[in-house]
Amino acid sequence: MSVRLLDDIINIKGDGTGVAGLRSSFKFIMITVLGVALGWFFAVKLGFDTVHLPFIGDIALGWLMIPVFAFSVVATGNAVNISDGLDGLAGGLLMASFGAFGIIALLQGQFMLAGFCFTVIGAILAYLWFNIYPARFFMGDVGSFALGTSLGVVAMMTNAFFLLPIIGILFVVEAGSSAIQIFSKKVFKRKVFISAPIHHHLEAQGWPETKVTMRFWVIATVAAFVGVLVALAGGHILL
């Protein structure tokens, strides 16, 4: 979070060199180091060394839990950051995802974790009052990455790492479309999308900003509902 806060401050005030913000490589390294440190604490100090695969069971990872945890945190943080491109978009998607994991945590008996998820939802609701179109306030890198990394941590604490791509399917699509666009431009020297990530592609095709946002909210809500159903049927929750 501190890395993104510094980046936002530099972006706003400028440093006199004409370079906006911190270098992407520096931010990625620092965030990865943070993810590995959190993964080590999660695996070594808290003793978490398994992940649950829906309908299969627990998979023992041992020390591999550290890179898996780091990937969950770093990938989710960056995916949410990429999704924060339209008024109200990231906030709505995050509400759906935190809602799903909050329900899963509640049914698992992790009441403090569930309380955290629902508190985040309350905070996002207050934020969305001012962020829906036309937005007056924006979360910036510090907000999107803090919430994204928190979502990744919650997924690990509910032992639902493999549910994260289902519940957060639109984060996967957003980040994936950007990755595909970058790869295609560098390797094939052409673009797959008119603009990336996908929400800008839809805008370029003539969709109004509010239409993209509301339809993504609908998809995110359905994905969250499906994720909870998979958690119930797949063995994440023992009733």
Report each predicted region and the residues it spans.
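"…together with the soluble PPM/PP2C metallo-phosphatase catalytic core" -> "…together
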Residues: 1-138, 142-172
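Cytosolic, membrane-interface loops and tails of multi-pass inner-membrane proteins
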Residues: 6-20, 179-210
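Juxtamembrane boundary at the C-terminal end of a transmembrane helix
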Residues: 46-48, 226-239
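C-terminal domain-closing interface element
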Residues: 138-142, 154, 200-214
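Short beta-alpha connecting loops at secondary-structure transitions
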Residues: 164, 183-187, 235-239
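Transmembrane helix segments
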Residues: 170-180
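Final/C-terminal transmembrane alpha-helix of multipass membrane proteins
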Residues: 211-231
